[in-house]
Amino acid sequence: MSNNNFKDDFEKNRQSINPDEQQTELKEDDKTNENKKEADSQNSLSNNSNQQFPPRNAQRRKRRRETATNQSKQQDDKHQKNSDAKTTEGSLDDRYDEAQLQQQHDKSQQQNKTEKQSQDNRMKDGKDAAIVNGTSESPEHKSKSTQNRPGPKAQQQKRKSESTQSKPSTNKDKKAATGAGIAGAAGVAGAAETSKRHHNKKDKQDSKHSNHENDEKSVKNDDQKQSKKGKKAAVGAGAAAGVGAAGVAHHNNQNKHHNEEKNSNQNNQYNDQSEGKKKGGFMKILLPLIAAILILGAIAIFGGMALNNHNDSKSDDQKIANQSKKDSDKKDGAQSEDNKDKKSDSNKDKKSDSDKNADDDSDNSSSNPNATSTNNNDNVANNNSNYTNQNQQDNANQNSNNQQATQGQQSHTVYGQENLYRIAIQYYGEGTQANVDKIKRANGLSSNNIHNGQTLVIPQ
């Protein structure tokens, strides 16, 4: 049985659609052999990716293997091209002997010492070194250009420059045998490369302004390329001194401009940091002031509340004291009224006792009417005569008493619910029974009952 028995009619009749085949065939004629291989692999991948109906089973596995091998080949080719380019660029790098490398190493160490001693003069020293030693060799210029970077960045650059300078020169003998014609051609090439470097350097400086974080990487790449190209220019200067000197001068001017741009960027960063510190310092001053104002406001509010509560408590205490005083006055008044009522009740009791005694006397007198009637009849005449005499004497005595009483007595008119005890307190200061009896005798009263509007005589 074949595999087609397991497929439906649609899968049996399917066909791959390759719309890019004609265009790729036209382009293949103009490419080289290497480009043809790459184009074939890419076309196979694109054709496989553009198929409307992807293959299954064995065909799919085959396509996966092809794509994997093509991708690995492409990566190997790219890596080989990059390595070839690096070897071609570095073919003219190492033209210095070991004595020159040692001198350069010593100079870089001295420059590191001076950099640690004076950080403020670092910028000026970098500019002066770029002007004076403009025609010197590129490794020296490379070590001086790194002086303009303060802090650990400059040290890292110098360490890398020392490591690049310490590489052994492998092709020194072969390069020393080259003639004057080759040197002249190299000089012309060095001048051309300095001009090319000028344009590349401007583009890199623009990218540095747009992105400060990639500044270190771009600076490292610039320094490496400058060192390589400076070495090429120095080789060409042996045959074409004029062209080489012009290229070196142009290179020094570009390095100077590059250092000034870096210094301006660093100054801008320092200014930004100082402005950030000023803003932070202002906020540090402002926040404690706001906190102190809030605390003082809270203290003032709580103090006012405490004073109000204190005043309220004082007023409440005063009200309570006044109320207690009024209550005590009411109690005293009630007690005095009770005492007066008790005294009046006792007087009433005494009066009732006296009335009882009078009744008893009247009873006793009525028990012997017959005995007394005879005596009365006998003494009627005597009594009449005595009565007349007594009336005369009583009138005389009463007149004399009235005259004496009117001379040192006062009168009082009864109003409201007054009684003899209150009147005695008003005139004598004490409501005793003796004072009440004095008023009763002066007014001829037999009881304590008095009525409203009655005029009483108050004796002295």
Swiss-Prot record:
Sequence ranges of Basic and acidic residues compositional bias: 1-14, 24-40, 74-128, 203-226, 313-359
Region (Disordered): 1-277, 313-411
InterPro entries referenced in this protein's UniProt entry, alphabetically: LysM_dom, LysM_dom_sf
GO terms for cellular component: plasma membrane
Subcellular location field: Cell membrane
Record's protein name: Probable elastin-binding protein EbpS
Main localisation: membrane
Domain LysM per the UniProt entry, residue ranges: 410-458
Keyword Kinase: no
Gene name tied to this protein: ebpS
Domain of life: Bacteria
